Curated annotation (Swiss-Prot):
The keyword rRNA processing applies. It catalyses: cytidine(1402) in 16S rRNA + S-adenosyl-L-methionine = N(4)-methylcytidine(1402) in 16S rRNA + S-adenosyl-L-homocysteine + H(+). It is found in: Cytoplasm. Specifically methylates the N4 position of cytidine in position 1402 (C1402) of 16S rRNA. This is Ribosomal RNA small subunit methyltransferase H. The gene is rsmH.
Length: 323
């Protein structure tokens, strides 16, 4: 098994040690990376064991990086272009999988490239699309009604001053279209005070627009529904989230699958038989990045890792024998 070394030097995968510990790649295993990005998880999984890996990404640049890595992997890596919400259609035929991992949010490649339009620190075209299809952030900012903009910023960015920001955006675009990240960031900064934590006032609004442009929560909901069906018995599903909206969805979906939906009402009749859940939580609480990793990689500070295990089917008693 040749070690795979082709990973862009600027990419730092978050909570890599914890992801590998949860997945525990084994020889002959089959794994799925739903968010290839810079290939950090993919490389680590393939180097950890003589296994096979299917990887998904909607970004053509990520697919190009993955295809280059696949040459080194000698047939152990297969790339699929598309969204991880469509993992069943894209890679389901290659399963069932012994492990599936999702690293949500924007990759460092996308943030660092001003021309992708994700960053409010570097001026570039107001795009924010992880792929190449669909409306851009500029389309939303320049065409949505004020109430729609406010709703996007509030729901997806959790921005309390969403109405004020939406009003300022509509006033600014009446003078001239908003086409760059620098323009938008300036508009937001002019009407939102910097908070005590010294977080840039544009942070939440940019998050809200990015989530809306890429339908990130819809993709996650579809993935949370599909991934459990693709797991082999004993398989592990790992999700790394970066903000509370993602984490709440992952927490709720995994709790339901693991039968952790709370105690039934005392007024409801008790079920005749309690079925063993098909899944279990690998950790009772989400894991966070270590202090050392958070210092070295600020993006890791908000990361939370949750994991689900597909329980082996219970053995059925032999007919005629006592159970």
């Amino acid at each position: 098994m040749n070690a795979i070394t082709l990973v862009h030097s600027g990419h730092v995968p978050v909570m890599l040690h914890e992801v590998l510990e949860a997945l525990s790649p084994r020889a002959g295993g089959r794994y799925l990376d739903g968010t290839f990005g810079g290939g950090g998880y993919a490389r680590a999984i393939l180097n950890a064991a003589d296994c096979t890996l299917d990887a998904i990404d909607r970004d053509p640049a990520a697919i190009e990086r993955g295809n280059a890595m696949a040459v080194q992997a000698n047939g152990r890596l297969r790339m699929h272009q598309g969204t991880f919400g469509d993992m069943e259609a894209l890679a389901g035929a290659e399963g069932p999988f012994d492990g599936i991992v999702l690293d949500l949010g924007v990759s460092s490649f996308q943030i660092d490239q001003a021309e992708r339009g994700f960053s409010f620190r570097n001026d570039g075209p107001l795009d924010m699309r992880m792929g190449s299809d669909g409306p851009s952030a500029a389309d939303l900012v320049n065409t949505c009604k004020e109430a729609e903009l406010a709703d996007i910023l509030y729901r997806y960015g959790e921005e309390k001053l969403s109405r004020r920001i939406a009003r300022a955006i509509v006033a600014a675009r009446a003078e001239a279209p908003i086409t760059t990240t620098g323009q938008l960031a300036h508009i937001i900064r002019c009407c939102v005070p910097r908070d005590r934590a010294n977080i840039d006032p544009a942070t939440r609004s940019f998050q809200g627009l990015r989530i809306a442009v890429n339908d990130e929560l819809g993709e996650l909901e579809r993935a949370l529904e599909a991934a459990p069906r693709l797991l082999a018995p004993g398989g592990i599903f790992v999700v790394v989230t970066f903000h509370s909206l993602e984490d709440r969805l992952a927490k709720r979906a995994m709790a339901v699958l693991a039968g952790r939906t709370g105690n039934p009402s005392r007024y409801e009749p008790a079920p005749l038989r309690q079925e063993a859940p098909a899944f279990s939580l690998l950790y009772s609480r989400p894991l966070s990045a270590t202090d050392e990793e958070s210092r070295e990689n600020p993006r890791a500070r908000s990361a939370r890792l949750r994991a689900l295990v597909c329980n082996p089917a219970p053995k059925m008693p032999v007919s005629g024998m006592p159970s």
